[in-house]
Amino acid sequence: MNINIICIGKIKDKYINDGIAEFSKRMTSFVSLNIIELKEYNKEDNINISIEKESLEILKQISKSNSYNILLDLEGKEINSENMSKYIENLKNIGISSINFIIGGSNGVSKNVKNSVDMKLKFSHFTFPHQLMRLILLEQVYRWFAISNNIKYHK
């Protein structure tokens, strides 16, 4: 299974990079992981322009492949780790070999992105910094594959 994390901006904090490196290493036996960092347009005067520019970059990435696209979104579906593990197994069983997880920038994504994905996934009612969300997502991806492979990680 190919897992692509499509995200906006670069990670600036060492502790987040360290966590990302750790979970990336753990996943090598389960998946081929690719983290695609797109340009952050946060410095624009107009937030809507920033959102549109970042969203255009996301749309370019997801149109390049025949992947299943999952957007992390506050309006998405809430699902627990066990059921998400089953969901991914079902995707594999129907022939999907690549999943794009999309983390928008700090200002969110456009309606075009929201309308172009296969699933919107909500992690929590809480709001997380988008850079920290990358680490949280990688931990969960590892957890989902650990569950489906009967690895003693998930409790």
Swiss-Prot record:
Compartments where found: Cytoplasm
Q: Report the main location listed first in the record.
A: cytoplasm
Q: Where does S-adenosyl-L-methionine bind?
A: L72, G104
- Top enzyme class, one word, equals transferase
- Record flagged with keyword ATP-binding: no
Query: GO MF terms on file?
Result: rRNA (pseudouridine-N3-)-methyltransferase activity
**SUPFAM superfamilies recorded:** alpha/beta knot
A Pfam entry, by short name: SPOUT_MTase
What is the catalytic activity of this protein?
A: pseudouridine(1915) in 23S rRNA + S-adenosyl-L-methionine = N(3)-methylpseudouridine(1915) in 23S rRNA + S-adenosyl-L-homocysteine + H(+)
Which keywords belong to this entry? Cytoplasm, Methyltransferase, rRNA processing, S-adenosyl-L-methionine, Transferase
- Protein purpose: Specifically methylates the pseudouridine at position 1915 (m3Psi1915) in 23S rRNA.
Quaternary assembly:
Homodimer.
Q: Which family does it belong to?
A: Belongs to the RNA methyltransferase RlmH family.
PANTHER family, alphabetized? METHYLTRANSFERASE, RIBOSOMAL RNA LARGE SUBUNIT METHYLTRANSFERASE H
This chain belongs to the protein called: Ribosomal RNA large subunit methyltransferase H
Q: Which organism is it from?
A: Fusobacterium nucleatum subsp. nucleatum (strain ATCC 25586 / DSM 15643 / BCRC 10681 / CIP 101130 / JCM 8532 / KCTC 2640 / LMG 13131 / VPI 4355)
